[in-house]
Amino acid sequence: MFQKYRPVWEEINLDNLVYNIGQIKSKIGNKELIGVIKADAYGHGAVEIAKVLLENGVSRLAVAILDEAIELRKNKIKVPIMVLGIIPHAFLDEIMNYDIEPIVPSYSYASKLSKLAESKDKKIKVHIALDTGMGRIGFSIDPNSVEEIGKISKLPNIEIQSLFSHFSTADETDKAYSCEQFKKYKLLYEELVKKNVKINMRTISNSAAIMELPDTYCDLVRPGIIMYGYYPSTEVDKNNLSIKPIMTLKANVVYVKVLESGSYIGYGRKFKCNRKSVIATLPLGYADGYTRRLFGKAKVIINGKFAPVVGNICMDQCMVDVTDVGEVNIGDEVVLIGEKDGLKFNADDIAEITGTISYEVLCMIGRRVPKLYIKGGEVVKIKNYVISSDS
């Protein structure tokens, strides 16, 4: 039982994380690896995950927003940090102050960065985003973009660290569109080379491309979901990469009661007991990322058996029918996401029954759920965001 304030927690298996990184490194050979740890490392805790990545061959990190980069810097993470989203002009000073590597979406943006860097007598490394078919951010693949990027490369105190793009369908069986994207990417890069535009690195490979498109590795690959032990989709060939989920969501039973047949459970009286039932209450709910969309579909692992979640999931609590799983007591451990006793109900399973993807399931787990980092079977770190506690 976890004794730190709240009987709900995530267990983050750092040995599995190290295993996953090792498998990725074996796959990519001598290519450089940038660990994508945006969204608090997909819900696993960015700072602690970053430390393990850097100890195991990851040389750079990528996040989505400036705040995430600053959090890493404030926790003494010193390696290059790329921000994948566009940082608003109002915060360009922070890019300099924290030595962050931003995305440059236009010449005017780069020009402002250049002037700021010049005024501080600093050099700033930037990443040029290309829109090869995602339709999100980045330069279009056309002659005007070649000219504009060429102008950026000539700005004082600016160094182009990478030319990067992102696949939109690499996790699908049909790779035709991804191949088309890569063709566009190479075409624009070759045009830049002809104009003597210096690009330090090229990067386009995401998790799915790492698994199935080795010709796209270029200089630097960007694994995300596969580091955390989940495949990008059901369409990728899992035989291409062996990985292990690193997170288990657990709770302790906080209340047990017997309800008579005909009793209702939860908001809206959506569940009615059709027999005399033993109901256990767990102290987590949709505010913790355990979504109401699981109504009538979720199950947990307790006493070596599955037990169904019944009634609408509340903000902070949910109820489980444990009538058929033997004696259940307050304090008993329950697995809500993960594996135990040969049974499995993980983020992929939740994604399937709620019509989403494992990424969202992992990222939804709220910051008020404490994280226990485990190595060699022992807890080596506890992170509780709510009370800003490390132990």
From Swiss-Prot:
Residues annotated as signal peptide: none
The protein's name: Alanine racemase
Listed cofactors: pyridoxal 5'-phosphate
Root EC class: isomerase
Recorded metabolic or biological pathway in which this protein acts: Amino-acid biosynthesis; D-alanine biosynthesis; D-alanine from L-alanine: step 1/1
CDD domains hit by this protein: PLPDE_III_AR
A GO molecular-function annotation: alanine racemase activity
Physiological role: Catalyzes the interconversion of L-alanine and D-alanine. May also act on other amino acids.
Species for this entry: Clostridium kluyveri (strain ATCC 8527 / DSM 555 / NBRC 12016 / NCIMB 10680 / K1)
Similarity section: Belongs to the alanine racemase family.
Modified residues (N6-(pyridoxal phosphate)lysine): K38
GO cellular component, one term: cytosol
Source taxon at top rank: Bacteria
SUPFAM superfamilies: Alanine racemase C-terminal domain-like (SSF50621), PLP-binding barrel (SSF51419)
